[in-house]
Amino acid sequence: MEKHMGMSRRQFAVGAGMTALAGAAVVASSASTAWAEKAPTIDEVNWDVVCDVLVVGFGGAGATAAIEAADAGANVLLVDKAPEYLEGGNTRYCEQVILGWEDEQVGYDFVTAMADGHEDVTEEIRRMIASETVKNGDWVAAHGGEFADSPIKLDEETFKKVFTNIDERIKSNWVGQMSDGTWTFFEYCTWPNTDRLNDYQVSHYYGVVAPKHHKGYWEFLRKTVESYNDKIACWFNSPATKLIRDRETGIVLGAVVDHAGTPTNVLARNGVVLASASYEADANKRQTYTGREGTKFVGSTFDTGDGIDMVAEVGAQLWHMNCLSGPFVNPPKPGSDQAWWCGGGLNRATDTGNSIFVTANGKRFMRECGMNHHGFMPVGDTYMNMQLPKKFFAVMDADGFATSQFHGKPTYVVVGMDNISQADTIEELAEKLGVNPEGLVQTVADYNTYCDQGFDADFARYPESLAKIENGPFYGIEYTGAFVNSQGGAKRDVNCQVLGWDGEPIAHLYEAGELGSFWGGVYIAGGNIGETMYSGRIAGANAAAAKDDAVEEPAGAAAPANEITVFDADAIVASYECGENEHVGVALGIHAPIVVKVTLDGETVTAVEVLSQMESPDVVLDLFTDMPERMVEAGSADVDLQTGATIASRGLQDAVKDAMARAGVVIEG
């Protein structure tokens, strides 16, 4: 055996290995204590405000944590970086479906399949998710809400924009057939094994009962927090910027909160809960953690992963940084880091098949049919995030355009979209898009041949989804990959305690929701919303629990003032003056209350004036001028809602009906 400086090759290798292990231990040790170099002790901080529990992030998880902590007797400060009525994170904007199951063991098997081999999603974690999820309904009911199983039944008319026919639905693995012959819509209906779960729905979509076109779960949480105004103080426009960890005790004492522009040291005697969402709205973090350039996001603009930066500074481990929902196939908003949310998980741009996706070389790169699973598609038997170019184009003919979301009266997905091009020929369209003309002409010709043959020789697109691109004019629309929610953050245990690099909990620091989500592996619809409840409950209760090392209240620190606006329709109405036959009404939209003044001639609407609203301009467009005009023309509030802005439309309609009801007009429906 060859010798090196008196050592055999084997001795050298073993010695090098031991040195590497020792080096790794030193690195881990250094990482777990480096935070202390610049950290203060409790006596070195001038505390401005004191509470029992500080919750950072007023979304689904933060609201739940605050409520649970208050139920345990804690005085809670709940802070959010957004202005009031823009708080809520993705919980405010999502579809409000809540993943759940009826049987704990079945839930465990399902979560195990979804974890898909992620070792850090341990059996203990999977058992916790399975058991805590079944408690969500009781928690909602205990706080005055109504929780219901909401199976999404399919029919050809309702879901014609999702699938061309039942064969495509089955092939996309999104549906199971019930014994009564109906099809039920739920994601991953073949897991935890490969058999289609006909008449046996493992995962259910629940929801908080609310009127149609309302954000039931979010409205329930916001209303509940409002009702706790003697226990939960809320601050808006107040991002937490830094955690304060005592260098001697290792306890997280509180945080620096930029309260309306003023750095404020907040002492949390019992614990801090971070529920400030993950990073999908931060372009740099998306590129860093996904390795993808040019992606966009859909959802709250405030979800920029601030908590990730804060936990890293106090020695926390990170996990699930590359776990995201997406990319979805969406058009980008011009001049924005966001994408338009249109098509949901559809892998094509039109309701019919008269379209393809191409890149700058004019060539196709994917099978444009069916649906992805929150951006995941099977590669063999493994579900993985789709690989999409950073920029590509939907190419369609007039027939396809007529069935797309870009046709007819403009909906919100069209506004400002100077990246929609129209041409009389494919060659001309290619020039306008900046796509290789020869490549695109050949691609369209090949695709049309496949349609005639009933077989896609390039990507095996479902035959029932094939329809030719042949009737001009022709259209091209820019697309990109867009992420909806991410799961990265601090690693946590089943008690929602944040773990340091040494694997031990960081004292008094907890985490809930998408920030450091338990979801590793494959994501499923409603998974994060269900998690807001069970992780919020656990984090809030544990943060509020009595502790032997609870921090003493310092002299001079004040209790936080509550800045939330409690919704009081009568008070809002009373704050406006009315003339003869004028009546004020109010109702909820997605954001602040929508307030209107309605003029009546008997029971006939003759004028509608919108007095106050905070809906997103690029979503509602001309809603607040167009819809009132249509109401006056009809003499009634019962007019069609605006496509693409149904919740704001419903809020406006409800506000007008409220004004009419206050005038004594009997409103039906």
Predicted region positions:
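N-terminal secretory signal peptides and thylakoid transit peptides that target proteins
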Residues: 2-20
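Glycine-rich FAD pyrophosphate-binding loop
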Residues: 72-91
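Glycine-rich loop(s) and the adjacent beta-strand/alpha-helix scaffold that form part
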Residues: 261-262, 267-335, 529, 535-538, ...
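Active-site- and interface-proximal helix/loop "cap" or "latch" segments in soluble metabolic
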Residues: 566-669
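Conserved redox-cofactor binding core of oxidoreductases
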Residues: 131-262, 283-284, 331, 451-471
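An anion/pyrophosphate-binding glycine-rich loop and adjacent beta-alpha core
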Residues: 308-435
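A glycine-rich dinucleotide-binding beta-alpha-beta segment and adjacent secondary-structure elements
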Residues: 242, 439-519, 610-613
